[in-house]
Regions:
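Metalloprotease/metallohydrolase-associated module, dominated by Zn2+-dependent proteases
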Residues: 22-31, 35-63, 69-76, 97-106, ...
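Acidic helix-start/capping segments at beta-turn-to-alpha-helix junctions
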Residues: 77-93
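Active-site-proximal beta-strand/loop segments in catalytic clefts of secreted hydrolases
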Residues: 84-89, 118-119, 136, 164-168
């Protein structure tokens, strides 16, 4: 009888361990599937071609396609495009350390020209690169100005539009970029301003 009880308890223990093991494998599979679904939802296939090795020209091509799909009639066709990397000393002429780029020749309707500080770009995540690129393209192509000058800012806004700063926070998410980018193309942010390019 004692032997039967031992066998019974051993069998019961083995069954419990087997069922627990199956439950853990099933739980891991469910968790893996959920994580994969979340990752797939976060990456818009439109941006899938951009990676750590993408060039400024790749970002420009993406910007143009994005502008078109957002309803912009002329994202810059027929213009001379001049995108390049600069270095920090290039910015010694009054541009502050919270800027990662600079637009040139903004009032010339035949060009789109801007530079991005290469050392910043190399350290940026893809989301930060998207923010910086769209910010500088906003100056160079659409003549957007920053919503406020530094001297006018008395408190931080609740939301930071793409044209607020050319350097997005490290923890900026892809979802935030998509929302801000949509507002960017719709000109939907507080205090939209343009460079004055009228000839006096």
């Amino acid at each position: 009888m004692k032997m039967k009880m031992k066998f019974y308890y051993l069998s019961l223990s083995a069954l419990f361990i087997f069922l627990q093991s199956c439950d853990n494998e099933e739980q891991e599979q469910i968790e893996t599937n959920v994580v994969e679904e979340i990752v797939e939802e976060e990456v818009d296939p439109f941006y899938a071609g951009i990676n750590e090795n993408s060039t400024l020209d790749d970002y420009w091509d993406l910007f143009v396609k994005d502008a078109i799909r957002s309803g912009k009639a002329d994202p810059g066709f027929g213009r001379t495009i001049n995108l390049f990397f600069g270095s920090e000393p290039d910015f010694a002429s009054g541009v502050t350390a919270d800027h990662a780029g600079r637009a040139y020749d903004i009032c010339n309707d035949e060009t789109v020209s801007f530079e991005i500080i290469e050392s910043f770009w190399e350290d940026f995540s893809i989301v930060q690169r998207l923010y910086t690129f769209y910010h500088e393209a906003g100056h160079a192509r659409y003549k957007y100005r920053h919503p406020y000058e530094a001297s006018e800012v008395t408190s931080r806004p609740e939301e930071y539009p793409i044209m607020w700063l050319s350097m997005a926070a490290e923890n900026s998410t892809f979802e935030e970029f998509i929302k801000d980018k949509n507002n960017f193309f719709k000109r939907n942010w507080e205090n939209v301003r343009y460079f004055n390019c009228s000839e006096d």
